[in-house]
Amino acid sequence: MNFPGMPGGAAPSGGAAPGGYDPNDPNIKMMQKAMESCFAKTVMSGGAGFALGGVFGMFMASMAYDTPYHSPTTPGTGPGANPAAAGIPGYKPVDLSSMPLKEQLKHGFKDMGQRSYSTAKNFAKVGALFSGIECGIEGLRAKNDLGNGVAAGCLTGAILAKNGGPQAAAVGCAGFAAFSAAIDAWMRMPSEED
């Protein structure tokens, strides 16, 4: 099927592949080389992590309002408010559900945006860190096997948990390495079609 502006028909023998794609074109080779660089992989993983984290954070924030643990908005909380006002006798917090609809929506969207952005930053950091480390390890070892993902997972987990001390870094290393090994092993399984 041909679409307007798209080349159609079969490729001549020995020439370009179907659709006008020539794998020997120097521009295509340059683009492939750029996309295979560690920098490009890290940036793409960080961007994909940011997008996925934003959607995930928005979804989780939308589910948080039906729990009794959600902190309601109170008068006097916000920029310039006195946090000690909660200890004043007679001070009663205003429940979110008793506010006007416009205020509820304003609070809900603001909270969703903050949570979504926070989750997006975290996913981007994890994705970029793991991808960059894995690509670096793959370049050093000159192999593409399960060991790269396990080592990258260990280093990523340890780096993310470094502020918790050496024990937290060891647990982070073990957890990320195990998760990475499980996902990588599943991704490398032969398909049912093979």
From Swiss-Prot:
InterPro entries for the chain: TIM22 (IPR039175)
Feature: compositional bias, Gly residues: 1-18
Any Pfam family hit: Tim17
Record's keyword terms, sorted: Disulfide bond, Membrane, Mitochondrion, Mitochondrion inner membrane, Protein transport, Translocation, Transmembrane, Transmembrane helix, Transport
Disulfide bonds: 38-135, 154-173
Membrane-crossing segments per the record: 43-63, 145-161, 167-187
Main location: mitochondrion
Tree of life domain: Eukaryota
Cellular component terms (Gene Ontology): TIM22 mitochondrial import inner membrane insertion complex
Cell location: Mitochondrion inner membrane
A single GO molecular function term of this UniProt record: mitochondrion targeting sequence binding
GO biological process entries: protein insertion into mitochondrial inner membrane
Topology of this chain in the membrane: Multi-pass membrane protein
Start and end residues of each stretch annotated as Disordered: 1-24
Keyword Cell cycle: no
Function: Essential core component of the TIM22 complex, a complex that mediates the import and insertion of multi-pass transmembrane proteins into the mitochondrial inner membrane. In the TIM22 complex, it constitutes the voltage-activated and signal-gated channel. Forms a twin-pore translocase that uses the membrane potential as external driving force in 2 voltage-dependent steps.
Assembly description: Component of the TIM22 complex, whose core is composed of TIM22 and TIM54, associated with the 70 kDa heterohexamer composed of TIM9 and TIM10 (or TIM8 and TIM13).
Family: Belongs to the Tim17/Tim22/Tim23 family.
Name under which the protein is recorded: Mitochondrial import inner membrane translocase subunit tim22
Lineage: Eukaryota, Fungi, Dikarya, Ascomycota, Pezizomycotina
